[in-house]
Amino acid sequence: LTAYVPQDGVAGGKKRTYPLINEKQTVLSSIGTIDFRHILAAKNEMENWRFLRFNPEHLRQPTSKYTGADKLTPSGLNLAAVLYRIKQEDEYSLIEISRELNRFIPEFTGVDVIDDVEHNQYVIYLQQRDGKIFSSRVLSEGTLRLLALCIIEYDNKVKGIICYEEPENGIHPFRI
């Protein structure tokens, strides 16, 4: 078995041959030149695909300021730091994130993140319609997952396709 990859736009141009028996990597991963620009473009696009598998324990955690990380990991680590960065860039985004979450969970009317200077961490808080405030540490798995997806929507560092298996996981059936 062999794969043949012709050069883009050139009749009789370069052609690469890839034997597929006992191959350890994909053909796509081995192409890195402009001679195959369409394949290179597809490869570059696919490198921006993000596969998320949120771990509720990671979503609950405040983000330590010592890590310096403000990019969401596939498991959900750094969610508070991501929200803090978004708040610093455009505080109005918190209102938009709050509205988006409220569309799915009407009980919650506000989303905020604080800089807990005493503990050197960022902590997420949600406010209910009755004024009660809850830390991310006590929120349900479904609420945390929906909150993370709402935050991702307003994160300008997220590019490409988001792949998220079973988005309804942990969400009450009446919310779907």
What is the meaning of each model-derived region?
Residues 1-95:
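Electropositive, glycine-dotted interaction segments
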